[in-house]
């Protein structure tokens, strides 16, 4: 895992920040070590309870990708396409 800050909104509650941080961690795991598709999609559903607008999701996703190199959008698309099993992007 690289050293960078997760994009967060300081107006969020602590609980909301934890939910969004869990999303960024799940994207990292999917790209580095892999994780179950259902766990990723559940984490995304929780993320959408905090980040409701697609515009905000895209903005945060871009900030995260610029910092980490991992794309929320591409990871989510792969999870939806795959549907089940272990989600693993990137090089083995």
From Swiss-Prot:
Coiled coil: none
Domain of life of the organism encoding this protein: Bacteria
Pfam families hit by this protein: UPF0223
Disulfide topology: none
The family this protein is said to belong to: Belongs to the UPF0223 family.
Protein name according to UniProt: UPF0223 protein EF_2462
Organism, scientific name: Enterococcus faecalis (strain ATCC 700802 / V583)
């Amino acid at each position: 895992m690289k050293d960078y800050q997760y994009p967060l909104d300081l107006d969020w509650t602590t609980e909301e920040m934890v939910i969004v941080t869990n999303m960024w961690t799940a994207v990292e795991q999917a790209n580095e070590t892999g994780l179950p598709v259902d766990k990723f999609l559940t984490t995304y559903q929780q993320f959408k309870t905090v980040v409701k607008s697609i515009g905000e999701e895209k903005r945060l996703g871009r900030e995260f990708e610029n910092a980490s190199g991992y794309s929320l959008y591409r990871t989510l698309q792969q999870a939806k396409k795959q549907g089940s099993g272990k989600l693993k992007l990137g090089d083995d």
